[in-house]
């Protein structure tokens, strides 16, 4: 059980929500603030004075006054008219994150929503009755309206859900969870729809995947150093301390740890090679820069996870209703775009190391890492696949946030495109997972060819993990299953856990 304290969520909590079947509960300490906010909205609605989002239309229709007897219909119509998403359903971890983030935002007490509505969301979450939310349809400003409308429609008994992974109607989902359809009161529909929770959930889910890919790339990169008989001198701490970037310093330390005790390295320590190619030698500099971007994005997304991104905002102590723009997801868009660049670069550097390993002139290994070249092509076309994926990522890494299209009759005339920025991270991450799988196979092949000299104790664990699924490449064979099985192990974090660098303790 994870207790959600609104405004104080942590990254470890969010990782568990995404990856484990943990249940959640709202911190009782938040109840008083929630109740004060709901009462403030009820008081404003009872007075009948115009207040945006409470008794007016929305967007360009904000100047339209809504009679008191139509306020409940207003909220229902808002939810139904905004449920216009298209595309495949959001993944289960993303929906779980989205619901938890929405509860945290509402739980700060500035949205004016009743506890009964929030309790229903908690009940659905814990019953594993998750709204079916189409992944496309948000521009990331005025909040993630369409995705959150699909979440909210389920509370009304409308739409579809997944009940323990099986698709069903929202009405059936409510029945399984022991709930009845809700009637939303003044502002509650808007409070549910306004917010950056969809884009933030997508970004967080992909952040966690990219963190694991980063750790895996440290392992594959270190293994490639030994496969290519590269030097460990470029990882000397003194070099990196002189530059001062934290990520570079930490990355270099990880490479030193992974390569410590390598007999391969000792065997060529006195060779006449002066410098390695950049893809080996500059790993701390490149991967350090990626690490800094990942950490920065994590910090931005954690702030957003704890934010109140509703509009308007209720301030119960003064009775004020303030319209602002906290729903604009530009911080999320920038964080996701920076993550995209970092993730693409992780894959691009790994592709260069694969190219180095298969080049006999650079690596000193048999051409394409296979004996009897000519009749055997070895890793020749596996590298082509890695190159194709790395090239694709260069297009996917183009920033989504540099684009904007006006919506709502130009009332909402600048938008963030954060949801797309966050969504395309999944495609980049999948490509990187496959590139790293190819590198791990190539590096393992190279290390085998360095026998009788062995790699380091830490990297021997990586070798055992690879060889448990894929044998040494002696002769050409149907290669695709080898890549697929190692890529699956990459996604399962089998190699990430071998890295001395961890994100788990970072908040």
Swiss-Prot record:
Keywords: Cytoplasm, Histidine metabolism, Lyase
Single GO term (MF): histidine ammonia-lyase activity
Protein name stated in the entry: Histidine ammonia-lyase
GO cellular component: cytoplasm
Post-translational modification: Contains an active site 4-methylidene-imidazol-5-one (MIO), which is formed autocatalytically by cyclization and dehydration of residues Ala-Ser-Gly.
Annotated compartments: Cytoplasm
Pfam families linked to this entry: Lyase_aromatic
Keyword Lyase: yes
Record flagged with keyword Membrane: no
Principal location class: cytoplasm
Gene: hutH
């Amino acid at each position: 059980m994870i207790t959600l304290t609104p405004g104080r969520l942590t990254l470890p909590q969010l990782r568990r929500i995404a990856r484990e079947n943990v249940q959640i509960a709202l911190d009782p300490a938040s109840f008083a603030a929630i109740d004060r906010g709901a009462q403030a909205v009820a008081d404003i609605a009872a007075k009948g004075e115009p207040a945006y989002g409470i008794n007016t239309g929305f967007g360009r229709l904000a100047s339209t006054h809504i009679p008191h007897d139509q306020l409940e219909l207003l909220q229902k119509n808002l939810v139904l008219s905004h449920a216009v998403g298209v595309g495949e359903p959001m993944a289960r971890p993303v929906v779980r994150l989205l619901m938890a983030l929405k509860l945290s935002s509402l739980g700060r007490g500035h949205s004016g929503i009743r506890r009964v509505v929030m309790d229903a969301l908690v009940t659905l979450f814990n019953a594993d009755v998750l709204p079916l939310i189409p992944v496309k349809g948000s521009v990331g400003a005025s909040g993630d309206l369409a995705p959150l409308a699909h979440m909210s429609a389920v509370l009304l008994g409308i739409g579809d859900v997944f009940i323990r992974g099986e698709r069903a109607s929202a009405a059936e989902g409510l029945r399984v969870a022991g709930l009845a359809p809700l009637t939303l009161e003044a502002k509650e529909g808007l409070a549910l729809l306004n917010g950056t929770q969809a884009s933030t959930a997508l970004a967080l889910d992909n952040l966690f995947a990219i963190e694991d890919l980063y750790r895996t790339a440290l392992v594959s990169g270190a293994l490639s150093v030994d496969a290519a008989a590269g030097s460990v001198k470029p990882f000397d701490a003194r070099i990196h301390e002189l530059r001062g970037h934290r990520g570079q310093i930490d990355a270099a330390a990880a490479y030193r740890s992974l390569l410590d005790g390598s007999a391969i390295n000792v065997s060529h320590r006195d060779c006449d090679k002066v410098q390695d190619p950049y893809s080996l030698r500059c790993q701390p500099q490149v991967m350090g820069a990626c690490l800094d971007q990942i950490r920065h994005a994590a910090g931005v997304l954690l702030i957003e996870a704890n934010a109140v991104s509703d509009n308007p905002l209720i301030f119960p102590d003064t009775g004020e209703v303030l319209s602002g723009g906290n729903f604009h997801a530009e911080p999320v868009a920038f964080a996701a775009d920076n993550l995209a660049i970092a993730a693409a670069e992780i894959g691009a550097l790994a592709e260069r190391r694969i190219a180095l390993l298969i080049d006999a002139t650079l690596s000193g290994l048999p051409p394409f890492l296979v004996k009897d070249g000519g009749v055997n092509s070895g890793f020749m076309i596996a590298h082509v696949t890695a190159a194709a994926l790395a090239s694709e990522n260069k297009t996917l890494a183009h920033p989504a946030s540099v684009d904007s299209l006006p919506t709502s009759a130009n009332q909402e005339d600048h938008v963030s495109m954060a949801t797309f920025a966050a969504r395309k991270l999944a495609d980049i991450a999948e490509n990187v997972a496959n590139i790293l799988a190819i590198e791990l196979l190539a590096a393992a092949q190279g290390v085998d060819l360095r026998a009788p000299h062995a790699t380091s104790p830490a990297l021997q664990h990586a070798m055992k993990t690879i060889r448990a699924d894929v044998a040494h490449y002696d002769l050409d064979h149907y290669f695709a299953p080898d890549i697929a099985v190692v890529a699956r192990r990459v996604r399962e974090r089998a190699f990430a856990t071998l890295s001395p660098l961890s994100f788990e303790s970072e908040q």
